[in-house]
Amino acid sequence: MAHDFLLILLFSHIISTNVHACNQTERASLLSFASTLSSRPLNWTSVNCCHWKGITCNKDGLVTHLLLSSKGLKGDIFPSSSSLGNLKCLTHLNLSHNSLSGSLETEFFSSLDRLKILDLSFNLLSGKLPFSLPSHNIQTLDLSSNRFHGAIPSSFFQQARNLTSFNVHNNSFSGLIPSSICLQSSPLIRLLDFSLNEFNGSISPGFGKCSKLQVFRAGNNILSGLLPKDIYNATKLEEIAFPFNSLHGAISEKIFNLTNLAILDLSFNQLSGLLPLHFGKLSKLKLLTLDDNHFEGYLPPSLMNCTNLVEIHMATNNLEGDISMLNFSRLSHLSKIDLHQNHFTGTFPTSLYSCQSLKAIRFTANNLKGQIQPEILSLKSLSFLSLIGLTNITGAMKILMHCKSLQILWLAYSFKGEEMLADEGVVDFGGFQNLRVLGFFNCELTGQMPSWLSKLKNVEILFLTGSRITGPIPRSLGTLPKLFYLSLAHNRISGEFPKELCRLPRLVHEEPTTTQVDDYVDLRIFPHSSLIYQQRLSSIPPTLNLSFNYIHGRVPTEIGQIHLVHNLDLSGNNFSGNIPEQISNLKNLEKLSLSINHLSGNIPLSLASLNFLNYFNVSYNNLEGPIPTGTQLQSFNDSAFEGNPKLCGSPLLNECLPINGVDADSKNNQGVDSEHQFPWLYIFTALGFIVGFWGVCGSLIVKKTWRYAYFKFLENVQDRLHVKITVLMTMMKRRLRGA
């Protein structure tokens, strides 16, 4: 019985092996395809190609799937793919994330007319698309992240009646976005992604005919004109994303037709008008992003009915109204709210404390007032809080230091008459332990900088500008392991420049990639940051700004150790002495400001090696000599050097005078060079004096007989000189008389 069972198993295995055996013609075609491309070894060595990695066959042993994503494939796609035309049942072809080049010809699609899924994304393909897509079966076509260019012919989709997804994101396509995709063909289309290209003109009517369309993306183009009216007829739409264009006009009240809409992103356009009153009918809305437009009026109260909202982005518009009148408590899923730079009034809405999912709040640059309540501690996930513009806040630090998840904190125009939280006021300090950015801008904080700041081991940006902080800079700040941006400008800080700041690890050593964490934060970091400084800490240049304080003494030579700093601003202090030559070690320096101090001496020639310097200012010091010639220092405006009467040379009108027939620049530059040369002449002179003095005088002091002989010798020399001079004078008188 057992013997019969084994025979049945063996027979079944033979049958299954024969059924799935690879077709030899197709095996040869696959090997031919691989041979025309360079790649990492595919390990296609076994007899049965159906067992090869990336290959799937049907029951007849014919290849249906060829999935070679991220295999390091290189070469021209068209000659290599011609052999794939023998794969008559191939329905899925994925060659994404490789380095394939060349263009797509009509023959490419003709030879693969059974394809349903074609993914060629993230390659180096280029050229224009063919006149038409000669495939009736194609359902998904992904050409994103390549180098295609030119217009997409309206005829391209004429035969693609089963197309459901078309993605050309991140190419260089231009011209109009083809609306004919819905008018003449592809009635089943569900996804259209034209974003990050060079499409221009207006969005033509026709997309309203896409009755199945769910996702429509066309952001980061050069689109203009109004939103197409018929887009509100595409009632299946779940996502509309047209950011970073030049669209204008208003959002129609007909938007309430799009009851399936979950994502609406129209940020960074020129849209205007009032927000639709019926936003509340979009019950599935999760992401509302209307930043950087010209919307005006009130935030519709009906928006509070969109209980699935996760993010609200309305920054940089002209919206107004009492924000405290809105009831946010129903938005239990709300994670981020950004109302930066509008005209909202009222107090901080306490109903936000009920939004337990909140991670980020940015209400900067509005006209809000009021206090931060202890209830904010109920927001356990709060990591980003920016309330610049919420004026006259007091006592907030004692509350916020207990927000355990807080990473970014920005406050401004507050703390009137309030002292910095002193060390004695902090018992077993455990607050702000996750803080990465601490920013107090134009506050009225007084008192000295507390040493508890040195316990913020995760802080990367410390921005305490425009307050009334006094006393010296704590040396312990130099121990902060992650600090790379320190701004203490416009305070009343005194004392000397602490050398410990020149040992800040993130300014001295490149952070190992193995220790870097995700530097993405929830919202834009700086209140008025450019797009460059969006939401990554790594995009912010390492900075040391101590300007406009009362710091005195010399700029330490150790300043040359902070190799990674991009911006160094010590202006408006009482620094004296020479400009340290070691500043030339800061090869990444882009901004150097030493103006309005008491610095003296020459401008070091070595500063000419700072190749990335685009801002330089040493005005109003006591510098002298020539401005180094033949360097980019002379490319700066004369205002960068004014206020130094003894400074000369271009770009100043004060020319350097010649010295002893030698060109003044040459002579003075020699003086600049000699300033930094080791003073060997003085050393050797001193050594000679010491050796001569002690060689003679020392021996006279030690040995009495030598001393007696020496003075006897001097007496004899004196007598002889007296005799010779007397004889010489007598002879001269006689000659004069004889004359």
Write out the residue ranges for each language-model feature:
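Plant-biased, solvent-exposed loop and capping regions
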Residues: 1-739
